[in-house]
């Protein structure tokens, strides 16, 4: 049904934007992992609405409740259920959208597939579905850090045509969180903030690119052929709302190079470890992690729901116009950063457990 992600570390998200709440059930989490609602809340606060002038003004605290699977601050090894209740839905803002399709949104395709849709807030197509992913990602991050020292940092690389200069090898979470757009390049960040604010006033939206670096990833994660590590990362990222592209390492720019230019030559470091001189592979070769930093980029389109009037049709095919009401992000990128980190953590945690189960080397 498309609501389940992962093999051994498996999540099932549930809930709708204007329903009673949203959440996640996590299966396969190892026992005795220390976790608290406070730790999960820190991640949820990074993606919650209403956090700044460049995000949706919907006011939700997104307070998480651990319903099961954790006892006295430690995971039990049983299913973990986490719930976040919706508190600030305004369904009346969507009355017009009950009949009219939003251009480039899921309204028309949900109707085409199911013959029915929840037009209040978009139902399952709303980005509030990602709350469950971010909550589960907080636990996955904890496992990765404890077992292997893995660190995951995502940040806004580009907004429209404004591109930041960022070193993925050294960037820190503190630098990312130092401004409301989550871009560690301070000069570029202010220009991005001004552009998003201007776009919001014009009742329009813009997109961009989130880059993510995964450090200290053990060698050997990933399965041959269909479950290659980059394939699962791509699936995870492309399952996020508004995503339109995925790159790893050199990405499409690598097509402009020759093999001798693109190949990451090997050497042995002072500790006797096999390393690569360059990292155009992005930390993965043959679908398996090679121990170098994994670097990916995810493209997000402009938010589909905008206040600017556009041509559309009704459910019965009558041509009309729509200037959408409601509270929506003029740019999803600042809030997409923790979503990208969460999906990266979920993929890596799942592959870490799978690798340990088969090879016993982590």
Curated annotation (Swiss-Prot):
Its cofactor is FMNH2. NADP(+) binds at residue 47. Pathway: Metabolic intermediate biosynthesis; chorismate biosynthesis; chorismate from D-erythrose 4-phosphate and phosphoenolpyruvate: step 7/7. It catalyses: 5-O-(1-carboxyvinyl)-3-phosphoshikimate = chorismate + phosphate. The keyword Metal-binding does not apply. FMN binds at residues 124-126, 286, 301-305, 327. Its EC number is 4.2.3.5. Keywords: Amino-acid biosynthesis, Aromatic amino acid biosynthesis, FAD, Flavoprotein, FMN, Lyase, NADP. SUPFAM superfamilies: Chorismate synthase, AroC. Pfam families: Chorismate_synt. It is an enzyme of class 4 (lyase). Reduced FMN (FMNH(2)). This reaction introduces a second double bond into the aromatic ring system. NCBIfam families: aroC, PRK05382.1. Homotetramer. Belongs to the chorismate synthase family. This is Chorismate synthase. It comes from Gloeothece citriformis (strain PCC 7424). The lineage of its organism: Bacteria, Bacillati, Cyanobacteriota, Cyanophyceae, Oscillatoriophycideae.
